[in-house]
């Protein structure tokens, strides 16, 4: 796969549908790899007429791991801009989930000339609106078992975490969850990167005053049953961005199961269509 460069930081990315006239840049969440935007989902975007680009955030997947280095969300936003530059894209529709939603908010603030539309999914605009249930918070705070010492315990831990924060209306099978945990470990395993990414989230502080100044077609998508970033996060995001549309989805938690593909796609494509109408 190609790599973009932001100074010394290398960002792994993958592009689908390079012949399409407009691009959707997909940014994923805390500690998660680009594969959380499945190829099947990207193919659906291509079928709707868009080029789809997904990436590994710094400290995740096959991108640079920054041992002993600190950074902020603005740096991660600049990584995404480096990907657009490497892919030859001047402006894009941007969509992000969870921490990725925070990154696309930061992109819209810092790089408005690069943004055609914004879709913020299961995210929040400030630390005060980033709330979790105790069980979901444990997903972040309880370290996984050492996979080299007890592989089955590691897999069981990952599967249990996925069920804790997942969508109750769109459950995964045990076989699907096991396959995901195993595939993600085989691709890359970097727990310290999650710690640094969490610090970047908190360091970015309150984006609401800056979001108030945006002028970009925006759709905010959030699960009514999200335990990790509770609904106040989506509600506050939509309230912060002028003209934003809020879509609260029953049965949706904090993941992207196949049963939600159409809902995610419609949110992204609605924001993109509004950008075209305003052009």
Q: Where are the model-predicted features located?
A:
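Acidic catalytic loop of the alpha/beta-hydrolase fold
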Residues: 225-229
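Catalytic active-site module of serine/aspartate enzymes centered on a nucleophile-bearing elbow/loop
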Residues: 244-279
């Amino acid at each position: 796969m190609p790599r973009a460069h932001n100074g010394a930081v290398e960002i792994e990315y993958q592009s689908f549908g390079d012949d399409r006239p407009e691009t959707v840049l997909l940014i994923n969440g805390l500690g998660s790899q680009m594969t959380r935007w499945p190829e099947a989902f990207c193919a659906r975007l291509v079928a709707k007429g868009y080029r789809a680009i997904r990436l590994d955030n710094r400290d995740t997947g096959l991108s640079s791991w920054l041992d002993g280095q600190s950074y902020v969300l603005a740096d991660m936003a600049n990584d995404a801009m480096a990907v657009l530059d490497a892919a030859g894209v001047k402006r894009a529709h941007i969509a992000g989930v969870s921490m990725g939603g925070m990154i696309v908010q930061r992109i819209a603030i810092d790089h408005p000339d690069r943004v055609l539309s914004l879709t913020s999914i299961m995210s929040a605009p400030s630390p005060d609106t980033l709330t979790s249930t105790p069980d979901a918070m444990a997903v972040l705070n309880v370290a996984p078992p050492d996979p080299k010492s007890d592989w089955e315990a590691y897999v069981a831990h990952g599967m249990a975490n996925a069920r804790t924060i997942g969508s109750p209306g769109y459950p995964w099978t045990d076989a699907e969850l096991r396959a995901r945990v195993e595939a993600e470990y085989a691709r890359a395993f970097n727990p310290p990167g999650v710690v640094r990414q969490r610090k970047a989230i908190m360091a970015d502080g309150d984006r609401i005053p800056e979001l108030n100044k945006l002028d970009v077609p925006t759709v905010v998508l959030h699960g009514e049953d999200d335990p990790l970033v509770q609904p106040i996060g989506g509600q506050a995001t939509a309230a912060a961005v002028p003209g934003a549309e809020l879509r609260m989805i029953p049965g949706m938690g904090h993941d992207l199961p196949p049963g939600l593909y159409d809902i995610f796609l419609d949110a992204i494509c609605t924001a993109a269509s509004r950008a075209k109408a305003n052009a």
